[in-house]
């Protein structure tokens, strides 16, 4: 290798390493296949061991059979019987197997006869041709010299023959020998003629060359085998070849050694390998045939001679000796080594069983033992492998393989045997042909015919599907066999190479590499030594120079890298700064453009509003006098109207003056369009009724400056007196109508917006003779209120209530007059009142009418610009629109824009612009995120003033009482806390989103884009705060009654009521319920067994209790009986008699005696008749009431609080017993249960019976039978097994209800009347149960109440002071109704929208209210309700900013829960100490 290669580190060994790695991968693959082969051999060996065990068992069975005599001698007959059965079964199975073998043999014979490829005539023609060629060849043998033998043809022929010999291994020898002569008649000469021909061929063989004779024989044999495909003939040929395998010829091996053609070596080796396998199979077949064949027809065809038997034995010995050397080869598809699942070869014709001869069994076991041994593959088929050429660069290796000659040894013997047999046969056939056909001419004719037929046959045989024929004439089967043998040999060579020579080649390559590397090292060391010679002189200088050079190169590289990086960063920075600067300039430019756009729109709107407001003087009407602006505003009357397209204006180039002029032109144009619209509406009517124009006052649209000077008095037809501020509102509304402008009357709730709007309608009818048509749209809850108010204040108006069913509305539409734009006093109607629902339903009809004035009460119903209400009402044809609302802003500024766009679509046409002007700043300020821009707020008020009028109560109404708002904070109870925590844990990941949703409140309630699941979750949390029973109510518990109830109790009761006295049916009712189980006792058992024992036990017990242990027995207690006799005047032994009487009768008699004694005492004092009557009266009424006060308190406060601790699951009366056929038992049971004295004493006497006894029969009351002695239960809870839920527990389980219970007690005590608002109707149901329990008088109004019922409920509340509580739904009962009879408002749960609650509380705090109104709001601390309340305060602040122009502190008192012993009262709520920092604000 050159020095430059070493210095450049060129490694030529790299390619070698890659090649070796590929060889190693191939070796790993082969090793895995070898392991698989070893596993398969182990598996086979295990099977052979199992076979040995079975054979041993068979041997033991034979011994057992041989010992049968001993068993008989020992008289063990039972075991012999069992063995005989076993032998019979074995014999039966053996017979079945023999039948199956005979069936197989018959089937194989039929198949062999059916397989004949060519007809007999064709075979005869071909045989004639071959005989003539053989005769010509034999004649030339004597003249020809030594020629080469074409070994591959003979080998191929032999391979075909050997394969043919293997094809019939299951037929018997006698059958194969008998089938030799079956194909043709030429073989009938017998076996002796064949021996003679063999001797003749041997003599001729001495004078000819062995190689040429073999060649001729091979060619002839190839043709003969092709002609004779009979199975029996191939079997004989295979036996002959196998018998001569030991006599191999060395000359043939020498000829094979001299051949240099590698292909011939490979072919011969492949054929030899196949022949080895065929010889081994052939030897096994011969061995099995010798063991199992039976001679048949010995005279005609003997099986074999002695010499052939000896040769067969030698063949077997040779096969056994060479078994370890020869390795079986198959094709890859049938390779046993690599295909363990391959099928085993079919067994021989006869099977060795346990009944076979001992030598056969031994021989079979030896075969099995030999088969069990793993074949040794250490011997290979070639002598050596040498590497002739190895090129690492081309990845190529050349190997020279030297084959062993042991294969040729067998081949030579096979060739000799085949040659001898064929020569003998050909001579015989040639001789016969010569004798039969002597004429030469005829032979030539036949030859020509045969030649033509042969040419046709050759053409047929040439097509072998592209397989190699090696120049021979062979069949497709032989060609396939040759190709397979070639492939097997080639594959086996590579297998042996992979198994044996890979490691050796690998070691050789490694040795070459190590040698080469060593040479490289030596060379490099020599080069280094030579190089050091001239470096040693200045080594240090060179070393320093190299170090400095490396350092300089490194520093230079770092410098340039740093320089490039800095330049790149500077360039990026400059580009970024330029981009940011351009972006900033563009943003500034765009912001200026947007500012100019907004300023243009604002200026346009301000000019319009300022002009209208100056004429209408809204500020003066509101009571807020504002100084005149110094700003020079354009006069819209002198400014020429012009429509300037907003998008066509160049805001970049126009200056402020030009933009302001264009804004004034647009404002003037909007004013002109508004006037033109109103004028067109009036002109249409003027053209229609020109005759009435003189009587009407004309609207002055040409001189609008005089509109502000108009002062309107109260209409005379208005049947009420307007207050001063209401009269100002009337002037403002009339000016708006004259100007043709729509407006919003936004006075605070309770200031009379309804009466002001009615007064405008009266003003139009009285001064302008405009009687309609007027349209009033209100919520459903205020429809009757509007009808009552209009009919009350303006009786001249004809009202058309437009609601009801579809048919009713269809009838009402007949009163419409669509021809006249203005109605007169004689028109069918003047004012039509309907609801928002009816407007949406009948929008198509209402849009066809032209309305003079449309009033929308509670205009927050159209706060959403996306709703169908807003869109339908906007499309109505109206001269003027008036919106009545106490809360123009409820949630955000978008709702205000919806109202402004509804009244002035030309000015407020874009919500995005309005949002850009005001919404962002005001809403963010309300949330506390930014400061408020006062300039923006001033401009907003300037825009809103002309269109909206709003007065608050404290400015216009001094006589109205105060309003106090109090937030009552409660803590969750134990059950509520658990429920809240469970819900919170289930939604832990989304709890923050739920709280935010609760804060967004009305946006969700209004049907926003929030997730419905979050809304449901918020409602669940609110339910927990209200009451836990909203989820699940406590059940009523009662035991299962296993009872049969009486079905005629009603009839019995009626009979009692109609009877004149006591009847026996009274007692029957007590036992009307019986047990379904009836037990019947046999009479004999009852009388002979049960009754005597019972009587004896009763007698013994009575004797012990009444005699032996009794204190009233004179024998036991003589002294006490004497004293008692002296005191009572009874005889000495009377006490024992009394003591033995019935216990219940003694109790009844005792009560009679005590009653008589008290009566006697009273008779002594005064007149008997008077005193008895008085005592009875007083004893029944006054005296128990006075003397039983302590008992009542004891029962009410203590005993009623006691509840059963256990409720049985099942109750049942006693089982019914009766004795079959025993009247005595029935009578005793009836007398015991239905004793009239006892039953009458325990039960009560019915009132009709008492009346008959006292009045008709004149029985004194003191002589009435004793009754009602059955003891009363402890309290109401023990009177029945039915357990009702405790109302006390129902109250204490809710924190809100518990505080409400305390509050209502104080409110009831101080004669307050209460409105309670709810959000959930189900909570209202629970509240009704509570009020019923506390016996509070109440009424209820919710969304399910009908319109007629709502009117009656409101009337009852206003007129009946006995009603303490009015339960209302916030949405249904918070709009448009007057409930001034109440002075206390309680919000059990708050609404999403704070304005809804404000409207609800103003139902009481409004005109007509003379008392102070107190508002309580129940809230639960630490829950979603707190977040909702905080958000509501933010919304209220937005309203205050927009409406009043400033923010004010909302001081609402917040009270906390108190200890249990301290009650919550209104007085305590209003007198909280200042130390708590909770302020209370009085709102007017």
Curated annotation (Swiss-Prot):
Residue ranges of domain Helicase C-terminal in the record: 1299-1463
UniProt short sequence motif DEAQ box, positions renumbered to this chain: 857-860
Compartment annotation: Nucleus
Biased composition (Basic and acidic residues): 155-171, 286-295, 426-439, 674-686
Reactions that this protein is recorded to catalyse: ATP + H2O = ADP + phosphate + H(+)
Keyword Acyltransferase: no
Cross-referenced Gene3D superfamilies: P-loop containing nucleotide triphosphate hydrolases, Tandem AAA-ATPase domain
Record CDD domains: DEXQc_INO80, SF2_C_SNF
Residue ranges occupied by any Helicase ATP-binding domain in the UniProt entry: 734-906
Domain of life, source organism: Eukaryota
SMART domains assigned: DEXDc (SM00487), HELICc (SM00490)
Start and end residues of each DBINO domain: 493-618
Enzyme class, UniProt record, top EC level: hydrolase
Biased composition, class Acidic residues, residue ranges: 454-465
Bias (Polar residues): 172-187, 241-250, 261-285, 1465-1484
EC numbers for this chain: 3.6.4.-
Binding site for ATP: 747-754
Assigned keywords, A-Z: Activator, ATP-binding, Coiled coil, DNA damage, DNA repair, DNA-binding, Hydrolase, Nucleotide-binding, Nucleus, Transcription, Transcription regulation
Cross-referenced InterPro entries: DBINO, DEXQc_INO80, Helicase_ATP-bd, Helicase_C-like, INO80/SWR1_helicase, P-loop_NTPase, SNF2-like_sf, SNF2/RAD54-like_C
GO BP field: CENP-A containing chromatin assembly; DNA repair; positive regulation of transcription by RNA polymerase II; regulation of TOR signaling; subtelomeric heterochromatin formation; telomere maintenance via recombination; transcription by RNA polymerase II
Domain topic, free-text comment: The DBINO region is involved in binding to DNA.
Assembly behavior: Component of the INO80 chromatin-remodeling complex.
Protein family: Belongs to the SNF2/RAD54 helicase family.
Biological function: ATPase component of the INO80 complex which remodels chromatin by shifting nucleosomes and is involved in DNA repair.
Protein name: Chromatin-remodeling ATPase INO80
Species this chain originates from: Candida glabrata (strain ATCC 2001 / BCRC 20586 / JCM 3761 / NBRC 0622 / NRRL Y-65 / CBS 138)
């Amino acid at each position: 290798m050159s020095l430059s290669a070493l210095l450049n580190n060129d490694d030529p060994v790299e390619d070698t390493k890659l090649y070796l790695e590929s060889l190693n991968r191939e070796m790993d693959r082969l090793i895995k296949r070898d392991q698989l082969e070893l596993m398969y051999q182990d598996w086979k060996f295990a099977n052979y061991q199992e076979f040995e065990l079975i054979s041993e068992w068979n041997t033991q069975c034979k011994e057992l059979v041989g010992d049968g005599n001993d068993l008989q001698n020992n008289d063990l007959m039972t075991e012999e019987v069992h063995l005989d059965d076993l032998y019979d079964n074995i014999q039966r199975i053996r017979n079945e197997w023999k039948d199956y073998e005979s069936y197989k043999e018959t089937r194989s014979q039929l198949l062999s006869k059916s397989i004949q490829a060519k007809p007999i005539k064709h075979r005869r023609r071909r045989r004639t041709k071959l005989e003539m060629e053989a005769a010509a060849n034999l004649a030339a043998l004597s003249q020809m010299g030594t020629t080469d033998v074409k070994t591959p043809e003979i080998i191929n022929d032999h391979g075909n023959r050997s394969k043919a010999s293997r094809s019939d291994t299951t037929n018997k020898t006698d059958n194969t020998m008998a089938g030799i002569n079956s194909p043709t008649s030429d073989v009938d000469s017998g076996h002796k003629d064949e021996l003679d021909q063999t001797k003749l061929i041997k003599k001729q063989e001495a004078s000819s060359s062995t190689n040429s004779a073999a060649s001729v024989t091979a060619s002839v044999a190839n043709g003969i085998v092709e002609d004779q495909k009979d199975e029996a003939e191939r079997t004989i040929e295979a036996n002959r070849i196998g018998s001569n395998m030991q006599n191999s010829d060395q000359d043939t091996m020498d000829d094979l050694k001299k051949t240099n053609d590698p292909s011939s070596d490979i072919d011969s080796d492949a054929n030899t390998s196949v022949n080895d396998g065929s010889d081994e199979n052939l030897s096994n077949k011969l061995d099995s045939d010798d063991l199992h064949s039976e001679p048949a027809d010995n005279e005609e065809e003997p099986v074999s001679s002695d010499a052939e038997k000896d040769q067969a034995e030698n063949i077997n010995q040779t096969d056994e000796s060479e078994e370890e050397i020869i390795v079986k080869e198959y094709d890859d598809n049938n390779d046993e080594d690599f295909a363990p699942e391959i099928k085993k070869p079919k067994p021989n014709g006869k099977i060795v069983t346990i009944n076979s001869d001992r030598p056969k069994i031994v021989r079979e076991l030896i075969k099995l033992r030999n088969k069990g041994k793993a074949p040794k593959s250490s011997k290979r088929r070639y002598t050596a492998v040498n590497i002739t050429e190895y090129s690492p660069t081309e990845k190529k290796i050349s190997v020279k393989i030297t084959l062993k000659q042991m294969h040729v040894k067998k081949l030579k013997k096979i060739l000799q045997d085949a040659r001898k047999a064929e020569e003998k046969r050909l001579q015989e056939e040639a001789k016969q042909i010569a004798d039969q056909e002597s004429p030469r001419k005829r032979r030539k004719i036949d030859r020509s015919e045969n030649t033509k037929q042969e040419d046709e046959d050759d053409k047929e045989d040439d097509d072998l599907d592209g397989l190699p024929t090696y120049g021979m004439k062979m069949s497709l089967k032989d060609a396939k066999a040759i190709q397979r043998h070639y492939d097997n040999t080639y594959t086996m060579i590579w297998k042996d190479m992979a198994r044996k020579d890979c490691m050796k080649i690998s070691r050789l390559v490694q040795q070459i590499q190590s040698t080469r590397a060593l040479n490289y090292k030596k060379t490099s060391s020599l080069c280094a030594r030579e190089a050091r010679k001239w470096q040693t002189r200045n080594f240090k200088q060179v070393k320093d120079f190299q170090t400095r050079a490396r350092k300089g190169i490194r520093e230079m590289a770092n410098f340039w890298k740093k320089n490039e990086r800095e330049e790149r960063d500077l360039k990026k920075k400059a580009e970024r700064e330029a981009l940011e600067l351009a972006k900033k300039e563009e943003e500034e430019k765009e912001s200026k453009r947007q500012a100019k756009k907004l300023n243009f729109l604002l200026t346009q709107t301000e000019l319009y509003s300022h002009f209208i407001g100056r004429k209408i003087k809204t500020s003066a009407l509101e009571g807020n006098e504002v100084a005149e602006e110094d700003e020079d505003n354009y006069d819209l009357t002198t400014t020429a109207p012009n429509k300037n397209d907003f998008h066509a204006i160049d805001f970049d180039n126009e200056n402020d003056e030009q933009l302001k002029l264009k804004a004034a032109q647009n404002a003037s144009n909007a004013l002109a369009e508004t006037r033109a619209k109103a004028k067109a509406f009036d002109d249409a009517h003027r053209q229609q009724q020109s005759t009435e124009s003189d009587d009407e006052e004309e609207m002055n649209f040409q001189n609008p400056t005089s509109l502000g000077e108009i002062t309107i008095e109260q209409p005379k037809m208005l049947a009420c007196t307007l207050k001063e501020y209401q009269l100002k509102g009337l002037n403002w509304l009339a000016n708006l109508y004259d100007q043709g402008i729509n407006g919003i009357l936004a006075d605070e709730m309770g200031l009379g917006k309804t009466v002001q709007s009615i007064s405008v309608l009266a003003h139009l009818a009285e001064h302008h003779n405009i009687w309609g048509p007027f349209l009033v749209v209100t919520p459903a809850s205020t429809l009757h209120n509007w009808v009552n108010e209009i009919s009350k204040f303006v009786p001249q108006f004809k009202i058309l209530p437009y609601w009801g069913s579809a048919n009713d509305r269809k009838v009402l539409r007949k009163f419409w007059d669509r021809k006249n734009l203005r109605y007169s006093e004689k028109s069918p109607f003047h004012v039509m009142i309907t609801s928002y629902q009816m407007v949406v339903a009948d929008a198509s009809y209402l849009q066809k009418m032209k309305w003079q004035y449309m009033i929308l009460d509670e205009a927050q119903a159209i706060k959403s610009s996306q709703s169908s209400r807003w869109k339908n009402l906007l499309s109505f044809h109206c001269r003027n629109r008036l919106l009545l609302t106490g809360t123009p802003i409820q949630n955000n500024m978008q709702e205000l824009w919806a109202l402004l766009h509804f009244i002035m679509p030309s000015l407020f046409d874009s919500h995005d612009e309005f949002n850009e002007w005001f919404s962002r700043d005001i809403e963010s300020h309300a949330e506390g995120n930014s400061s408020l821009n006062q300039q923006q707020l001033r401009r907003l008020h300037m825009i809103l003033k002309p269109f909206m009028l709003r007065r608050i109560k404290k400015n216009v109404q001094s006589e109205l009482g105060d309003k106090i708002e109090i937030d009552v904070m409660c803590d969750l109870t134990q059950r509520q806390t658990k429920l809240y925590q469970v819900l919170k844990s289930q939604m832990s990941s989304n709890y923050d989103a739920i709280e935010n949703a609760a804060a967004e409140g009305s946006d969700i309630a209004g049907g926003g884009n929030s997730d419905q699941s979050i809304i449901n979750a918020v409602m669940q949390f609110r339910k927990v705060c209200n009451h836990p029973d909203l989820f699940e109510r406590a059940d009523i518990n009662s035991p299962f009654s296993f009872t049969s109830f009486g079905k005629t109790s009603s009839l019995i009761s009626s009979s009692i009521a109609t009877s004149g006295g006591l009847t026996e049916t009274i007692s029957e009712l007590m036992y009307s319920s019986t047990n379904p189980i009836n037990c019947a006792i046999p009479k004999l058992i009852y009388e002979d067994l049960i009754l005597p024992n019972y009587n004896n036990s009763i007698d013994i017990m009575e004797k012990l209790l009444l005699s032996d242990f009794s204190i009233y027995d004179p024998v036991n207690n003589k002294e006490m009986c004497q004293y008692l006799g002296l005191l009572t005047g009874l005889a000495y032994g009377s006490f024992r008699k009394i003591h033995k009487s019935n216990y219940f009768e003694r109790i009844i008699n005792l009560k009679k005696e005590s009653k008589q004694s008290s009566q006697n005492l009273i008779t002594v004092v005064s007149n008997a008749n008077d005193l008895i009557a008085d005592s009875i009266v007083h004893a029944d009424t006054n005296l128990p009431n006075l003397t039983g006060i302590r008992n009542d308190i004891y029962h009410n406060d203590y005993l009623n609080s006691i509840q059963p601790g256990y409720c049985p699951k099942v109750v049942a009366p006693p089982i019914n017993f009766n004795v079959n056929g025993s009247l005595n038992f029935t009578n005793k049971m009836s007398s015991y249960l239905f004793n009239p004295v006892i039953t009458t004493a325990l039960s009560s006497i019915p009132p009709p019976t008492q009346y008959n006894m006292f009045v008709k029969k004149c029985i004194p009351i003191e002589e009435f039978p004793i009754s009602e002695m059955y003891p009363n239960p402890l309290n109401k809870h023990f009177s029945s097994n039915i357990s009702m839920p405790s109302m006390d527990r129902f109250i204490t389980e809710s924190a809100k209800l518990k505080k409400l219970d305390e509050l209502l007690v104080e409110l009831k005590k101080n004669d307050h009347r209460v409105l309670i608002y709810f959000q959930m109707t189900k909570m209202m149901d629970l509240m009704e149960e509570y009020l019923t329990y506390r016996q509070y008088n109440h009424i209820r109004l919710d969304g399910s109440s009908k319109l007629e019922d709502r009117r009656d409920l409101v009337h009852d509340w206003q007129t009946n002071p006995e009603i303490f509580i009015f339960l209302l739904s916030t949405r249904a009962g918070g709009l448009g109704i007057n409930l001034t009879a109440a002075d206390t408002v309680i919000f059990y749960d708050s609404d999403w929208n704070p304005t809804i609650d404000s409207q609800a509380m103003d139902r009481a705090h409004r005109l007509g209210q003379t008392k102070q109104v107190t508002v309580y709001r129940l809230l639960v601390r630490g829950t979603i309700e707190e977040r909702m309340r905080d958000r509501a305060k933010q919304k209220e602040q937005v309203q205050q900013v927009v409406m009043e122009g400033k923010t004010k502190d909302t001081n609402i008192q917040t009270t906390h829960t108190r200890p249990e012993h301290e009650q919550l009262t209104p007085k305590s709520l209003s007198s909280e100490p200042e130390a708590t920092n909770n302020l209370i604000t009085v709102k007017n």
